[in-house]
């Protein structure tokens, strides 16, 4: 079975017999917050009973954190679970995606036989989403996905363009999904979120996750925000009733209290991203100037395999529609780890 995502630490260990320095997964480099680990341990006595299928306590905490009504929140087994639930609930006939973007959108759409239309983003624009994407929405489109910032490019779509996209989708009868799973890494997140549009846009769904910012990828926890509670009810009914374990629910509530940890992650990324980008450029590589906790760059096609032999993993992006072999994505990690990546690349590329 071929995997399409990064973060396959188990596959690397099985192949090489040891763990890699993993730059292929875009999670916090500071590890699981201690408060979250403690909450998981404290919740172990609840493992002998079914979890709350409505995630009541977690949704209450999320409502406070997001400053939104609890009925506008649906929790899931990671953002990917919610992507599939939405697609299964809507069963769209035709959907629009930018290319490149996160692979799971297309995978979910194809699982219901949906025709996937892609609007290619251009290297000349640093793969930015432009007005052309808004204009590509028409009456034949049922569902639109926008990743903010986009994965793997790290590009931010300006809020004004997002607003126009929301209006265009509403006029055409399409549901718009804005995936903000990486937005919380940005210090300017409050100015970029689409949350203020929810009140007047029942066709808007925002996806968020604990996976990345809190290094909880193995816990599996995400949530959707939408003012259309009937749509959220359909999404709830589209999957299994106990989608979020009691341990994940406890972990999520604890993570929301880890404000100092989250601030530290944001500060680290803001400090290290430009330094890592400069280091890659110093190696003669083309780097896309994104804003996320990862960087997209172009290098010799053999780079990924050569780094794996030296214990370092990148995300090869050649399987993204809209990108070719030789494009790679690297996470931004701690200063020593980033320097180890650059030093290993110097040895490989010399």
Model-derived regions, located:
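Short loop-beta-helix segment that forms the pyridoxal 5′-phosphate
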Residues: 51, 63-85
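Conserved PLP-binding catalytic core of the aspartate aminotransferase-like
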Residues: 270, 280-311
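PLP-dependent aminotransferase-like
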Residues: 88-146
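Active-site phosphate-binding strand-loop segment of PLP-dependent enzymes
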Residues: 123-187
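PLP-dependent aminotransferase class I/II
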Residues: 31-33, 54, 203-288
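Short acidic capping loops at alpha-helix termini that bridge into adjacent secondary structure
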Residues: 69-73, 180, 202-203
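PLP-dependent enzyme catalytic core of the Aspartate aminotransferase-like
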Residues: 309-310, 319-350
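N-terminal "arm"/small-domain region of PLP-dependent enzymes with the aminotransferase-like
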Residues: 1-49
